[in-house]
Amino acid sequence: KLADFAQENQIDLTIIGMDDPLVGGIVDEFESRGLRVFGPRKNAAILEGSKAFSKDLMKKYNIPTAAYENFDDPEKALVYLRTEAKFPIVLKADGLALGKGVLICQNLQEAEAGVKEIMEDKKFGSAGNTMVIEEFMTGREVSVLSFVDGKTIKTMTSAQDHKRAKDGDQGLNTGGMGTFSPSPFYTKEVDEFCKKYVYQPTVDAMAAEGREFKGIIFFGLMLTADG
């Protein structure tokens, strides 16, 4: 319908902001009709659409990321949590969940309940068919948005994003409770490190995988005591 509207009304340029239509392939549809559109194609939008994919990509290309394991079987996830996990630990629904598909579990009991919630009860729908279990890291979270043309990346200013609901960060993650910019923790040294080891390597990795990314990439950084 959107492509029909753009065609009928001779829209010069369409900018897609929402994750869902990008992951669904709306850019491919527009391009197939010769319409100008800004955003990643379906095979590149998976970077945001699948946490398991993005974690595997970072691991393959040595881009810094928290230690993790991916699971598509809840029983195997539970075995891992009972035998190998260190707490607190983070459970993430693989797919899009409006920024809410992340659970921080303080102990095994909470983690077992989290697996049930994400993978069995499908609280986040098909987004929970696969789940990422990730090392819990403490530090300052910083968000950086960037413009990408498939090869070159230009970052915007940093932002301090507050995701958790309730006063004192007592609630669950949300799509965002508030933000301010720039972040005082995003120093010149951090910027230089990220440009060298995170930003450009991510663009290059996507191109190497045949998934050239054109659009805006969101980088969620965790600045820890170890870097």
Where in this protein do the model-derived segments appear?
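Short, acidic/turn-prone active-site loops that include or flank metal/cofactor-
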Residues: K1, R41-I46, E117, Q160-D161
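ATP-binding N-terminal substructure of ATP-dependent carboxylate-amine bond-forming enzymes
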Residues: K1-K42
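Short, charged, surface-exposed secondary-structure boundary motifs
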Residues: A3-D4, I46-A52, K166-G168
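Residue-level detector of structured alpha->beta connecting loops
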Residues: Q10, G34, N62, A85-K86, ...
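Short, well-ordered alpha-helical microsegments
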Residues: V23-G24, A77, E141-V142
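A conserved helix-loop-beta module that forms one wall/lid of the active-site cleft
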Residues: F38-G101
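Internal nucleotide-binding/catalytic subdomain
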Residues: C105-G227
